[in-house]
Amino acid sequence: MFSLSATDLSLKIREGEYTPSEVVEKHIDRIESWNPKINAVAEKMFDQARLRAQEATLRLEKLKQGKIQNAELPKFFGVPFTVKEMLGVEGCRRTGGSIHRRHDVVDFNATVVQRVIEAGAIPLCTTNVPELGFWVESDNPIYGRTNNPYDLKRTAGGSSGGEGALVGSGASSFGLGSDIGGSVRMPASFCGVFAHKPTWKSVPLSGHFPRTPEELRGVSSETYSLTTLGFLAKRAADLWPLLETIKGPDDFDPETKKDFVLQPLIQDFTNVRVFFLSDPQLFFCRRASAEVKETVKRAALGLQGRGAIVEELDSKIFKNAVEIWGAATSSQGQAPFAERLSLGGTIDYFSEFMRLLVRKSNYTFPGLVTALLEKLPNLGSNFEKALCELKDIDRILQSKLGTNGVIIMPVYPSVAPRHRAPYLAPFDFVFSGIFNALGYPATAIPMGLNSKGLPLGIQVAAGPFQDHLCLSLAVEMEKLFGGWVEPKLPE
């Protein structure tokens, strides 16, 4: 059951091999086994999930009795899934990992959550995030720190780290997340699963932290977030149907594109141009490790063997990615980070850093440092220059990629780092974040395990609204390299 894709699991439910109640109960049991080790769950919805599963099981009985047709059952019928805590789930807290919002409970479902529920899936729980969703590790004063299912001493990533850990452990068929700087792709890569960040503005943000759906109606294009809602999954077969389910405009988000048509997956790669970048040279970032570089090259060779046209991309094309990502996110007109962190109050930085030493601070170390860095002068001096460079890179890449080109490169310069190690390399996330600045679709793809049993991975990016290319390569890479490898439950 746990090795199946969500679409195959739903098919087996329809065929009567499993009941929705049985599937939900098995996944709850697995969460209860894994969560004491990985601490991925924010809020459980097990009782509600059991009720939904009972209703689905009764519906399945009607199918057996011929009272309804198989075609009337939605695509993810009876399949359990999980949701990043920053997405609204009716009746659940949506705190963003902020101590000041620890009592916030929402009375709505985010649009993507509602669409997946309407597609037949059953939510089991919400999952852990960093403070305000702003760090590579999922750790906050409310829920604590999430661990990697392949090595508890390592991070599961952020900001959708709870999703990475639960999906990676096999306790969730798929999970909904969000991505502003690699936030679905890094957890997926660290935890050995797939993730897709769709093209910017192809999926409505309605219900994502901190706004309500109604508040999103008043957002202008100048203040619209670079955040894109996406998903993580154990199997590549689920990526295309998930995107087809959540994409498209709703009644709240004024910026979601109305004319995005998700094209079918391709199976012939002879016309695909692959630009690989195994060793990106980015200022303020580490170089890719030897095993990460080799993994990218292995993927490129695999596609070359399938007939794709492969060539190397300039290793310095993203050299200023840190400044570019910073300028792109700053141009969205958000409130200062310190104001969001304190919920409009003031922060006594000296006191809070002292309290951190005895683990009694209201904030995390990354949150306090980010708020302080924002106060430094001249950080915006190269703002316009960086935005101009972003436009130049976009122009160069779109001329190369067209409608049949992809980029293959690392998600992150190493496998999942040990806890707190990202403090020493805080900007490495821009290996992924550059595609948020560009607005391109990007997919994290697992590539097996290294000699220490840790997941290896790559990401594939394409031009705007060419998501199907990324998803097609994910399916092909899974065939070539095996995809998700189930971890063992730690003792």
Task: Label the predicted regions.
Residues 1-181, 301, 306, 399:
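Gly/Ser-rich catalytic/binding loops embedded in alpha/beta enzyme cores
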Residues 138-142, 189-193, 322-330, 424-425, ...:
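Short low-complexity, flexible loop/linker segments enriched in glycine and/or proline
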Residues 33, 114, 118, 168-278, ...:
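Structural helix-boundary/capping segments
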Residues 1-71, 245-430, 437, 465, ...:
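Amidase signature
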Residues 96-102, 421-425, 460:
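Short glycine-enriched, charge-decorated loop/helix-capping segments at active-site entrances
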Residues 134, 184-185, 213, 284-285, ...:
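Glycine/Thr-rich phosphate-binding loops of Rossmann-like dinucleotide-binding domains
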Residues 127-128, 178, 410-412, 447-448:
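Short secondary-structure boundary segments
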